[in-house]
């Protein structure tokens, strides 16, 4: 049986690498991988036109995920303009597309509170408005194996494990922490299920404190002064289960995820 052609951007990123690993294990797909340096080619626009024309499905995972990047032109180019180009080509050739968005789109009171959030929000809104076969997945706080290269953008679990101590913001901020395996399964879920075009949330539907994560890891912590809290900082994020894809549910609890992650980190020192 011939394999389906699948185009995946962000092939060297945290989520992209894990998605590829999962798809390779299924052995149903011929995956064309695009990484960031692809766009440095003088002819990348024609090349991607050809790739999209010849593929069956697009997983657009690649992005500038650095929420600390304040360069408007750089962030909007990578997260909006490149996405818009891909979405337009997907529409031209009538291709299904799954777009990796972010809970940063929810921001505060339903609107993004930082540049990264606005760039992803603009991209998903353009995609859903112009493509009939478009699914955006708003990932919440993803952690797990494969995020080692992310540096300051890696999860609190990874950073705390490496430092053996951690400084937290005061006032009890909470996040919806979701294990990478659940995110991978959500990302490929539309491939195997008839999911309507739309914007969906990928989290657990539970908010957990950073203190709880560190306590599960037996990591010591202290607190920053309130004066260092960034403007627009989100103190709570939690996915709305009503916004999950039909029949998709996360399977890994925080306790299970942290245990598996620590085992992985110990084995890969």
Q: What residue ranges belong to the model's regions?
A:
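Active-site segment of SDR-like NAD(P)-dependent oxidoreductases
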Residues: 12, 64-66, 102-107, 113, ...
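Glycine-rich NAD(P)-binding loop of the Rossmann-fold in SDR/ketoreductase-type enzymes
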Residues: 73-85, 114, 118-119
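C-terminal substrate-binding subdomain of Rossmann-fold SDR/epimerase-dehydratase oxidoreductases
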Residues: 162-269
């Amino acid at each position: 049986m011939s394999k389906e052609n699948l185009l995946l951007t962000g092939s060297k990123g945290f989520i992209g690498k894990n998605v590829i690993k999962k798809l390779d294990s299924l052995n149903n797909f011929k995956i064309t991988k695009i990484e960031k340096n692809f766009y440095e080619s003088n002819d990348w626009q024609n090349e991607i036109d050809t790739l999209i024309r010849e593929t069956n499905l697009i997983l657009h995972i690649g992005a500038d995920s650095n929420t600390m990047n304040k360069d408007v032109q750089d962030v909007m180019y990578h997260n909006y303009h490149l996405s818009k180009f891909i979405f337009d080509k997907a529409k031209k050739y009538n291709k299904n597309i799954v777009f990796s968005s972010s809970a940063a789109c929810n921001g505060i009171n339903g609107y993004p509170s930082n540049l990264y959030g606005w760039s992803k929000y603009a991209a998903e809104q353009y995609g859903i408005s112009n493509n009939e076969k478009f699914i955006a997945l708003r990932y919440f706080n993803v952690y797990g194996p494969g995020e080692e290269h992310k540096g300051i953008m890696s999860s609190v679990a990874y950073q705390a494990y490496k430092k053996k101590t951690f400084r937290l913001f005061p006032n009890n901020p909470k996040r919806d922490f979701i294990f990478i395996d659940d995110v991978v399964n959500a990302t490929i879920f539309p491939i195997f299920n008839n999911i309507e075009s739309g914007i969906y949330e990928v989290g657990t539907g539970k908010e957990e404190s950073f203190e709880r994560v560190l306590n599960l890891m037996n990591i010591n912590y202290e607190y920053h002064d309130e004066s260092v809290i960034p403007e627009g900082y989100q103190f709570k994020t939690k996915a709305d289960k009503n916004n999950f894809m039909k029949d998709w549910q996360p399977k890994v609890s925080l306790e299970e995820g942290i245990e598996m992650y620590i085992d992985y980190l110990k084995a890969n020192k």
